[in-house]
């Protein structure tokens, strides 16, 4: 059994790691990585049980982070989308010497909604978990639709996300279940103030999974971080507003090179 994750590396320059979200795989970054590789050495990973990476045992959150760190460049900027943002944030907390800059996209230190904190309602997360047991392909497709919901170009966004995800093997059912548990249970809100490297938080104003209110909460938790809001984007701004996304990302990375 393989004990390593599938990575793609392209381009030359300073190292940049891209981490996908729940139910997805590294192919969602294809357009983004092609453009970024003109300026950076871009490393795209398939998390355990996703895409071309075999399920490396029933990994919990900390183990998933260790798996990515084990094969990531010695030092790099880390960019994580959605669930990938949680993984990148945890890597930056546990191994700050490895993460030169941290960028989270449509992500939150706590995805689950609770009193005084916006997020995904626990009931929705538990419904996804139940649906996984009966039809996990349909569950992933439903999640794709939720990601684009609110975007003016929702149909086109879903089409692009589906094309990318279905270009690689479907995710492992156990990996999907573990990912949902992470989204439901992990809470890094008290830890993020410890981050010492430059941090940029990117949001879609129309995001239904990470409500824009989270961006305002995070202003208080991380007053020294940068915040970028894509006004017409939903949960996948790098899909719906790719050129604008890359421009903002490059500006941040160049400012903190």
UniProtKB/Swiss-Prot annotation:
Please tell me whether the keyword Transmembrane is annotated for this protein: no
Active site residues of this protein: 82, 207, 235
Q: Which Enzyme Commission number(s) are listed? A: 3.1.1.85
Instruction: State any GO BP term from the record.
Output: biotin biosynthetic process
Report the GO molecular function annotations.
Answer: pimelyl-[acyl-carrier protein] methyl ester esterase activity
Q: Name one GO cellular component term.
A: cytoplasm
Keywords of this protein's UniProt record, alphabetized?
Biotin biosynthesis, Cytoplasm, Hydrolase, Serine esterase
Reactions catalysed: 6-carboxyhexanoyl-[ACP] methyl ester + H2O = 6-carboxyhexanoyl-[ACP] + methanol + H(+)
Asked whether the UniProt record includes Cytoplasm among its keywords, one would answer yes
One protein family per Pfam: Abhydrolase_1
Alphabetical list of InterPro entries matching this protein: AB_hydrolase_1 (IPR000073), AB_hydrolase_fold (IPR029058), BioH (IPR010076), Carboxylesterase_BioH (IPR050228)
Ranges for domain AB hydrolase-1: 16-240
Which residues take part in binding substrate? Answer: 22, 82-83, 143-147, 235
Record localization: Cytoplasm
Name its pathway.
Cofactor biosynthesis; biotin biosynthesis
Q: What does this protein do?
A: The physiological role of BioH is to remove the methyl group introduced by BioC when the pimeloyl moiety is complete. It allows to synthesize pimeloyl-ACP via the fatty acid synthetic pathway through the hydrolysis of the ester bonds of pimeloyl-ACP esters.
How it assembles, according to the record, is:
Monomer.
User: Which NCBIfam families does the UniProt record give?
Assistant: bioH
Stated family: Belongs to the AB hydrolase superfamily. Carboxylesterase BioH family.
Q: What is this protein called?
A: Pimeloyl-[acyl-carrier protein] methyl ester esterase
Q: Lineage of the native species?
A: Bacteria, Pseudomonadati, Pseudomonadota, Gammaproteobacteria, Vibrionales
As recorded in Swiss-Prot or TrEMBL, the protein's gene is named bioH
